Amino acid sequence: IIVMDKNVIKQIILNQQDFIGRIKLQSRNVCFEENANYVLVGIRRAGKSYMLYQHIQHLVANGHSIEEMLFINFEDERISDIRKEDLYLILEAYRELFAFQPIIFLDEIQNVEGWEHFARRLADEKYRVFITGSNAHMLSREISSTLGGRYLTKEIRPFSFSEYLEYHNIHLPQHWELSPIRADVVRLFSDYFYYGGLSEVFDIQDKKSWLQSLYQKILYSDIVMRKGVRNERSLRLLIRKLADSVMQPTAIKRLQDILQGDGTKITRDTIGSYLDYLHESYLTFGISSFTDSISQRESVKKRYFYDNGILNLFLFLPETKLLENLVAIKLYNKYGDDLYYYNKNVEVDFCVPNDGLLIQASYRMIDEATRNR
């Protein structure tokens, strides 16, 4: 049994305090209640860590000292083997450095099995705690039950286009489309359209390589390793087929037929599990037909990607699919499970029955059938 070295934890605490005190951040709108604890979840690189950095700088600007901040990134290779039995050492290490009651930030803790018991104890002992993770399983009933209502949750999504413009210091005046700023907006929208809203990609030259690396990290670390996927080839092929099928309702049986046609033996249950894994890791989400029965809604869905940049890795001549995917992202972020598509007698890309909304997404209006819809 390897026992974690407290001196390593101390070094990490001090390193993070120094780093967060110096880093310059682009502000993003997020509000935390003053005395609440939080779990932040979302796709990797959506900006969860930077939201914590921003909040720490806000706390320091409003009277706290940086020494009160206990920030641990669990993807730091120096503590990659930490176990739940070692988590108490984090507080011990901090107390040997400082006499404050710390405000605790636990970044990407989901890979420490049983982390929720430590989080529950911290809340019970009246610490203020902020936790981030890249897996929707952190919102599951089992974990929520262990946390016992002591944490509020926020899902952090990639930047919207309005946030993307703010990041680039673009503020739209009235009638902006007739002003010189229009050229900047068009240029930035093109980047956002093809490369998505994950903030770390914004200032990178080789965006496609960065997105490919991120995709491989999510696939391998958050799905293959975490879930024990034995047939990685079939999972990769499924993701490609989902990208090809964006805009189209797809049944699990149909996916099975497609995969088996490519020589992959796979059961419907396995495909169902893979789809759950993709949703939990914030790669894809699905919407159901408003006219389907409850059972059909689970088995037949239109599936989209949480970020256009990752979807675009798989596409050739991508514009039509990227546009509908971008509309789906915007609507899903706003309406969640109240968003459907409609396909009885007439096809409608998106509908929100509670608000009486019917929305059609079309990149070009040349096709007469598209205009008629």
Task: List each language-model region with its residue ranges.
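Accessory nucleic acid-recognition modules appended to NTPase machines
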Residues: 2, 68, 202-357
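Interdomain motor-coupling "hinge/lid" segment immediately C-terminal to the ATP-binding subdomain
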Residues: 5-17, 136, 142-249
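Hydrophobic anchor at the beta1->P-loop junction of P-loop NTPases
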Residues: 40
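Walker A (P-loop) phosphate-binding loop of P-loop NTPases
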Residues: 44-45
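Conserved lysine of the Walker
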Residues: 48-49
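Short glycine-rich substrate-engagement loop in P-loop NTPases that contacts/grips substrate
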Residues: 70-102
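Conserved catalytic/switch belt of AAA+ P-loop NTPases
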Residues: 116-131, 145
